[in-house]
Amino acid sequence: MGKHIQYQGGNFKNTAPTKYQPTDLKVEEVLINIGPQHPATHGILRLEVILDGEIVVDVVPHLGYLHRCFEKHAATLPYNQTIPFVDRLDYLAAMNSEHAFAMGVEHMLGLTGKLPRRVEYIRVLMAELNRLASHFMAIGTYGIDLGAFTSFLWLMRDREYILRLFEWASGARMLYNYIWIGGLYYDLPVGFEERCLEFITYLKPKLEEINQLLIDNTLFIKRTANVGVLPLATAINHGVSGPILRASGLRLDLRRIDGYSIYPELSFDIPIGEGLMGHVGDCWDRTWVKFQECKESIKITEQCLVRLTSDLKRTADFNPQKMVPKKVRTKAQDCYIRAENPRGELGFFFRASDNGDKPIRCKARSSSFSNLSVISSIAKGQVLADLIAIIGSIDIVLGEIDR
């Protein structure tokens, strides 16, 4: 009747003679494509993955599916008309991107340090609220990647409060055009500070619930601890920044190092990876650092609200557009400005012409682009299922990568 398989003590024994011995079997590597339309890639990203069985041999990211010519737009439009395009870089942190771009142009105009204090505090308040919303999206979708759906729903519920505050202040939920060169589109609506403080008070215990539900969850720890370890030297060599770099053990935060805007006046800590559940720089550390940064953003937000409701409270004669130039005209110069976005260093290099209303060249330095570049280094030797965990922990936005 041909070959039979007999079960003997846990081993299957082939009673018929075999033509090939196990040592003669050939193993071939398999190439698969993940994306560009795949929820686990967090955007329009294609990963060319070479596998030996289920072990990742190499990963090659392919970009360009979301390229929208930002730098060409920036070189052909007046400075103030470029801000709506800046919103579309990291569309999950548009306030932070606007802040960085506005600071760059203000530096060229000689306005650094001359803006009204209320304007500066409102800018930082909005930037930190947007950092919270961005980290909520990052941690929530990461939970989905690993099979934890409830945490995503809870974080999206809390993120919705922030989007409603932004909509109240700017009229938009995601792409704001609120931070203008030299000022703001509009002062905060009456009652905004009080409602924002109510939200922060509500949020504190909710974060502890997320910590118990996801961050300290045994299954989550098993899926992320000791997975995708990013050594500090590798992170520095690839230009990694933000929470991904800090998770590898380097306490580097541009808000503290550069001290831009009013951050030197604020008190906050800079969490770094400590390897509490595994190895420093693993997937769990990257998620834990982002979670701790949410707590620090709450501290900064509270300090801003205290100032905005006391010595910097609204007055009838306050005009947030007082320093906004009607037409931006710069001197011939080169300028590079950077800011600490939720995903790391966002920088803008300007080459300006004399008395020009637009730059000769505007180069955007994307944090997500540099952070994604380490995927090949840290994914090799991991199983395919862990590759998904690694991508989610890096937290990329393709709008910022492709530009």
Curated annotation (Swiss-Prot):
NCBIfam families: PRK06075.1 (NF004739). Belongs to the complex I 49 kDa subunit family. The keyword Kinase does not apply. Its main location: membrane. It is found in: Cell membrane. The keyword NAD applies. This is NADH-quinone oxidoreductase subunit D. It catalyses: a quinone + NADH + 5 H(+)(in) = a quinol + NAD(+) + 4 H(+)(out). It comes from Amoebophilus asiaticus (strain 5a2). It is an enzyme of class 7 (translocase).
